[in-house]
Amino acid sequence: MKNIVVCIGNGLLSEAIIKMLKNSGEFQPFRVLIQKNSNIANDCEALSADILLLDVSYASGTTMETRLKEVKQVREKIPTCKLVMLCDENSAPDIAREVVNAKKDGLIDAFFYSSVTEKYLTAALASL
């Protein structure tokens, strides 16, 4: 079973993803709240995260700039943790392009659009 830290700004989406991951039987999900002085790298280390799933949006705390700083810190602290970004390719195509570029540049291990099915998302995460 993989430990997955879920850091998603939208509470409803976060809860739905956590429920989906729990129900798959392949993950032990942990929700990390977005707070001004939080340190996701420390949280991931404390929770022995195998995967960190982050959303990227225009909202404060979830911007691409913020998320790239966070993934850099996690990569330095826990090099084996897989870094995964989730974004909405329809409402934020510019963010989606930035996320694709982050993957191309090796800054993250994978990305998903929020339009994917839950079956695909769980299967792809399990394969990391």
Task: Give the predicted meaning of each segment.
Residues C87-S127:
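Output/docking surface of receiver
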Residues E45-L47, V74-T80:
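Conserved phosphotransfer cores of two-component systems
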Residues M1-V5, G9-M20, T117-L128:
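Non-catalytic signal-transmission and effector/linker regions of two-component phosphorelay proteins
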Residues L52, L83, A110-F111:
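Two-component signal transduction core modules
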Residues I34-I51, G61:
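Acidic, metal-coordinating helix/loop segments flanking the phosphotransfer/catalytic sites
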Residues G11-N37:
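Two-component/phosphorelay signaling modules centered on CheY-like receiver
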Residues V6, V84-M85:
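Structural beta-sheet core signal
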Residues L52-K77, N90, I95-E98:
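Conserved phosphotransfer microenvironments
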